[in-house]
């Protein structure tokens, strides 16, 4: 396995209808080094009758690891639901169990930079040693890298960082150009997600459906993957 940057298949890429061991086997056979796991998918594994020790044994059996944990949402709500509070704690537990350093997070609700930064600061304090990776998504309250960096910068937390995703990048109409991230230190980018997009996007009202169900493999869409990777490499 790559010591620092394991090649990981995201949890949603493998859907939510397969058993845990089938998920691990599929990722292994496809050449991935690790799997991402959503809190919901972890709960599904427990619902299969597996315990934490069984999950770890399956991973060890196939020489795989969980290398990504997600997904904390609604973290900027003034009054968070118990479901979201519990999901957040579950993500912390998963990081401890699988020795994962970061949690992917998104925010659908749209608030000011100042308010969002304050709520991100509170989340980072709760996360402690774990990195909070903020994922800009064009249909969300943090639609692009510009607002994403403004929020992370204003939060001023060592464990607040950003995620770059090819699909979200293109659908946010951001040019694949270093100028977009020129003010963002390279060490504030915690994860790079590589995929591809169709030339014509879904309608704005259903853009999230495309994000969830109709992405393309790297290099099979409009051809931005190589340029995106080159940009990331040049950034350092």
What do the PLM-derived regions correspond to, one by one?
Residues 8, 104, 217:
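Short aromatic/hydrophobic contact patches that present stacked aromatics
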Residues 10-14, 38-42, 71-74, 107-110, ...:
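Active-site beta-loop-alpha junctions enriched in small/polar residues
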Residues 16, 127-129, 135, 172-176, ...:
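Short, charged helix-to-loop "capping" segments that act as catalytic/coupling loops
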Residues 46, 79-82, 145-149, 170-236:
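Gly/Pro-rich active-site loop or hairpin
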Residues 21, 58-65, 76-164, 171, ...:
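Active-site acidic/histidine proton-transfer and metal-coordination neighborhood
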């Amino acid at each position: 396995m790559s010591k620092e940057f394991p090649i990981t298949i995201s949890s949603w890429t493998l859907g939510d209808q397969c058993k845990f061991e089938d998920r691990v086997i599929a990722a292994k056979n496809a050449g991935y080094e690790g799997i991402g796991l959503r809190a919901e998918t972890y709960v599904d594994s427990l619902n299969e009758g597996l315990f934490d020790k069984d999950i770890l044994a399956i991973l060890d059996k196939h020489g795989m690891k969980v290398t990504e944990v997600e997904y904390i949402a609604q973290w900027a709500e003034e009054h968070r639901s118990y479901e979201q509070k519990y999901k957040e704690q579950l993500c912390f537990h998963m990081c401890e169990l699988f020795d994962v350093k970061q949690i992917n997070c998104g925010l659908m609700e749209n608030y000011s930079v100042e308010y969002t930064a304050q709520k991100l600061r509170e989340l980072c304090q709760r996360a402690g040693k774990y990195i909070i990776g903020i994922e800009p998504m064009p249909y969300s309250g943090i639609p692009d890298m510009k607002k994403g960096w403004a929020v992370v910068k204003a939060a001023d937390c060592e464990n607040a960082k950003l995620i770059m995703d090819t699909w979200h990048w293109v659908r946010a109409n951001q040019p694949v150009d270093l100028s977009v991230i020129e003010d963002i230190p390279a060490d504030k980018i915690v994860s790079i997600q590589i995929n591809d997009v169709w030339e014509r996007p879904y309608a704005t009202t259903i853009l999230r459906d495309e994000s969830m169900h109709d992405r393309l493999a790297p290099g099979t869409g409009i051809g931005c993957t190589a340029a995106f990777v080159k940009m990331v490499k040049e950034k350092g």
